[in-house]
Amino acid sequence: MKTTFLDFEQPVADLEAKIEKLRFVQDDSAVDISEEIARLEAKSQTLSKNLYAKLTPWQIAQVSRHPQRPYTLDYARHIFTDFVELHGDRTYADDKAIVGGLARFNGQSCVVIGHQKGRDTKEKILRNFGMPRPEGYRKALRLMRLAEKFGLPVFTFVDTPGAYPGIDAEERGQSEAIGRNLYVMAELKVPIITTIIGEGGSGGALAIAVGDQVMMLQYATYSVISPEGCASILWKSAEKASEAAETMGITAARLKSLGLIDRVVNEPAGGAHRDHRAMAQTLKRALQDALRQVADLSPAELVEKRLERLMSYGRFKEQKVA
């Protein structure tokens, strides 16, 4: 698949285009230009690395939405074995914006749940652009209760602009479905490991993100509203999205410093979309470590620590100024 470059990656895109032309020339010529191609490839990697080392929050938001980033089903294929997808909420329908099922993680049975976006137009519509309806959250809830029944750890992968705001979703109880998930996940008696792999959009993300260990990929985002939405409210213009992203603190590094997540998982040079397999292997090691930290806790200890974690959000200390 040909790499899609973002606007700020144009210098890299130009260099890659030049490399592609040289490859074409080499295929049709007796002249050996492999050294020149290798030199330009090294230059491209260095340029990309330097570019990504100083991304702004708004640029990170764009990377988190990159159409070629690995999605939940990609990680299910690369990290887990024997994945069997389960469908439906047993109440209304099967929401394709959330996928989930049984799998094995290093030989251990587990449950995998996550948002799923589409690659092409047809799949994007099928997946509703990764925006779940109530039946999607109720499907996730059904799988979490199944995990609790059989004592299986739960791995959740978050990547959504937010819960679907359509009238049909509201009629079927969107807010109740999200609230119910938060309530049940807070007291689920099995380990929950959550990873924000792309966009973490508001309650639509949080509904499968109440975990014992919460991680974020390096160029993922997590926020109560999109930068464009925030800018439209505060400045009456989505053109202020860059300023909003800076103000909101949506990046993994910022959220780690605030204690809202436990770990930042580094991405390959140029982002996770550049190398799905490398990203999956890095994430697998992080998941192993996260599960190891909670695997030996009793159900009561899991719930106690999870509730303590939730209640710690927003705490602050007052200091008197002399």
Swiss-Prot record:
GO cellular component: acetyl-CoA carboxylase complex
Pathway linked to the protein: Lipid metabolism; malonyl-CoA biosynthesis; malonyl-CoA from acetyl-CoA: step 1/1
Keywords: ATP-binding, Cytoplasm, Fatty acid biosynthesis, Fatty acid metabolism, Lipid biosynthesis, Lipid metabolism, Nucleotide-binding, Transferase
An annotated Gene Ontology molecular function: acetyl-CoA carboxylase activity
GO biological process assignments: fatty acid biosynthetic process; malonyl-CoA biosynthetic process
CoA carboxyltransferase C-terminal domain ranges (all copies): 32-293
Protein location: Cytoplasm
First-tier enzyme category under EC: transferase
InterPro entries noted in UniProt: Acetyl_CoA_COase_a_su (IPR001095), ClpP/crotonase-like_dom_sf (IPR029045), COA_CT_C (IPR011763)
Catalytic activity: N(6)-carboxybiotinyl-L-lysyl-[protein] + acetyl-CoA = N(6)-biotinyl-L-lysyl-[protein] + malonyl-CoA
Broad class of the protein's primary localization: cytoplasm
EC number, UniProt record: 2.1.3.15
Function: Component of the acetyl coenzyme A carboxylase (ACC) complex. First, biotin carboxylase catalyzes the carboxylation of biotin on its carrier protein (BCCP) and then the CO(2) group is transferred by the carboxyltransferase to acetyl-CoA to form malonyl-CoA.
Subunit comment: Acetyl-CoA carboxylase is a heterohexamer composed of biotin carboxyl carrier protein (AccB), biotin carboxylase (AccC) and two subunits each of ACCase subunit alpha (AccA) and ACCase subunit beta (AccD).
Family stated for the protein in its record: Belongs to the AccA family.
Name of the protein in its database record: Acetyl-coenzyme A carboxylase carboxyl transferase subunit alpha
Record organism: Aromatoleum aromaticum (strain DSM 19018 / LMG 30748 / EbN1)
Source organism phylogeny: Bacteria, Pseudomonadati, Pseudomonadota, Betaproteobacteria, Rhodocyclales
